[in-house]
Amino acid sequence: PFHWDSLILATGASCFVPPIPGADGANVVAVRTFGDVARVREIAKTAKNAAVIGGGVLGLEAASSLAEAGLSVTVLEHGDQLMKRQIDAQAAQHLESAMAGKGVKLLKNADSARIDASGVTLVDGRRIPAELVIVSAGVRANIRLAKDAGIAAERHITVDDHMRTNLPDVYAAGDCASMGVSYALWTEAADMGRIAGINAAGGDAAYQALPRPLIFHGFGTALFAFGDTGRQANIAYEIGEMPGARYYSAGGKLVGAVLTGDIRRMEEVTNLILQA
């Protein structure tokens, strides 16, 4: 047994694979590790068609790479817009146009009924040929160890701003932990780990959760979104538009922005929003 004075749980997260019949097939990959990438490359050597379940950043990056490798790619998006919680409709349309320009098909409101070795059958009966299927449906925190130990956890291990759990001298950090919102990003995990380490060693440091930007490169274009990009129905936004950029203001303050194509000003824009 190991003895400790302070303990940090950093159990991470695992890919969420929806309970679709056939999702455990040899041609289905949820990409999380280098081993998963190696599997994709091996299957892609003989595959002609690929389907990507999930239209988030990682799914679209995978779709872009597969298209570059010469595969015929179809993206299956559950919702009616790509990345609806993060980008506005105009940015989503920009992405759709870029995808079409690279020959990548997008099906929205597309729910998978089953997967087999030759493709995906949708709930509405449509058949998508795919010898390779990538599932990109988000992650789920690995919390079983914490729950078995009596640590408070629902979707994530619950921590305060010092990364403390409900048990004395037990901390948690990274994708497994949350103060209420989790972006499951490396930068966030690194910041949380630093705070947990300081406090576990007897220091006193508090974690400040910051909004995280969305950055995407693929299909010959790029996209950046940060802050509130017009998603609140009860807010009267003022929208400023320039070629490849939209700025959202509310109450006289800049609250969000979306850049498409040329995103070199993303750091400047981020600072302007944070300072507003």
Predicted segments with their positions:
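Glycine-centered tight beta-turn/hairpin loop motif at sheet-sheet or coil-to-beta transitions
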Residues: 1, 123-125, 220, 242
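Short hydrophobic core segments
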Residues: 2-14, 53, 73, 128-138, ...
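Glycine-rich dinucleotide-binding loop and its adjacent helix/turn
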Residues: 6-69
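Redox-cofactor binding/interface segments in oxidoreductases and associated redox assembly factors
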Residues: 9-10, 52, 122, 135, ...
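FAD-binding beta-loop-beta segment adjacent to the flavin cofactor pocket
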Residues: 15, 157-171, 228-246
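FAD-site-proximal beta/loop scaffold in flavoenzymes
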Residues: 24-47, 118-121, 126-198
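Rossmann-like dinucleotide-binding cores of NAD(P)H-dependent redox enzymes
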Residues: 49, 58-113, 207-223
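Mid-to-C-terminal Rossmann-like scaffold of FAD/NAD(P)H-dependent oxidoreductases
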Residues: 176-267
